[in-house]
Amino acid sequence: MSNAYPDKHLKLFSLTSNTAIAEKIAKVVGVPLGKLSSRQFSDGEIMINIEESVRGNDIYVIQSTSYPVNNHLWELLIMVDACKRASANSVNVVIPYFGYSRQDRIAAAREPITAKLVANMLVKAGVDRVLTLDLHAVQVQGFFDIPVDNLFTTPLFADHYTNLGLYGEDIVVVSPKNSGIKRARSLAQYLDAPIAIIDYAQDDDSSREEGYIIGEVAGKKAILIDDILNTGKTFAESAKIVERGGATEIYAVASHGLFASGATEILQAAPIKDILITDSVYTEQELPSNLHYLSASELIGEAIIRIHERRPVSPLFAYNRKGDEA
């Protein structure tokens, strides 16, 4: 959408974590990013000044809570407070990557459920709605007492691979761990492809090279899919296992690219032809030469328009391959 959006009560603001995707989203919606200043004092305190009126407006604040997670989370909370105190009609937060979503349960004695704590903080600050992209655990939506729209990236990936001719029985979609079966099955259904799963006798880093494949990958082009690419170890070890299993080509796709230190070297050494991620996270880390970005801005921008116009977002979850009947 390139034309100016007609409703002047819709305003978008970008905080500092990922201004690149925010600018793209603004172009899709047809609304320029609002003016604000965000700075830190010498002791680390954050100060935000909204440099235009938001009174009576529906505000959408775009901020991924990625590295440095706590700085970006606090910046978001402070911005929400500023909007509420400036008499905004509604404050909606757009969080392409939702940090702390991996801490969604008590996995060992005396651990916190930090995803719930973050949800409480956002609600208490005055957030009216959350729009996010591929939560690590979909049950995090239930931690909020406000509406949460969790958009899926699988249709974007399906469209990308279909355009490359990567669909049908010659393709296999591989989940690199059993917790990702649902995600792999979703992409496989879109691509009319079978799935395979890599499982391990023990679920720890020391046994990653000892994984075994459930399903058939021999003679097929394999697409590894995960939600978060952090250290690169999961993809790298899974690619080696799939290569030993007889896959002819190996692709990897993830919703969020965090790229911890050393991830690029690990991925460069892996037998992966192409890595695909969305632009939900901005990073200054050196990236693998075989990495490509797929922007989620159009998906998020269309969701913002639909939410503002009180139209359903459910059509954004559908995907029909070109040539298929709707």
UniProtKB/Swiss-Prot annotation:
GO terms for biological process: 5-phosphoribose 1-diphosphate biosynthetic process; purine nucleotide biosynthetic process; ribonucleoside monophosphate biosynthetic process. Its EC number is 2.7.6.1. The keyword GTP-binding does not apply. ATP binds at residues 43-45, 102-103. It is an enzyme of class 2 (transferase). Its cofactor is Mg(2+). GO terms for cellular component: cytoplasm; ribose phosphate diphosphokinase complex. It is found in: Cytoplasm. Pathway: Metabolic intermediate biosynthesis; 5-phospho-alpha-D-ribose 1-diphosphate biosynthesis; 5-phospho-alpha-D-ribose 1-diphosphate from D-ribose 5-phosphate (route I): step 1/1. Belongs to the ribose-phosphate pyrophosphokinase family. Class I subfamily. Mg(2+) binds at residue 136. Keywords: ATP-binding, Cytoplasm, Kinase, Magnesium, Metal-binding, Nucleotide biosynthesis, Nucleotide-binding, Transferase. One of its GO terms (molecular function) is magnesium ion binding. Homohexamer. This is Putative ribose-phosphate pyrophosphokinase 2. Its main location: cytoplasm. Involved in the biosynthesis of the central metabolite phospho-alpha-D-ribosyl-1-pyrophosphate (PRPP) via the transfer of pyrophosphoryl group from ATP to 1-hydroxyl of ribose-5-phosphate (Rib-5-P). Binds 1 Mg(2+) ion per subunit. D-ribose 5-phosphate binds at residues 226, 230-234. It holds the Pfam family Pribosyl_synth. It catalyses: D-ribose 5-phosphate + ATP = 5-phospho-alpha-D-ribose 1-diphosphate + AMP + H(+).
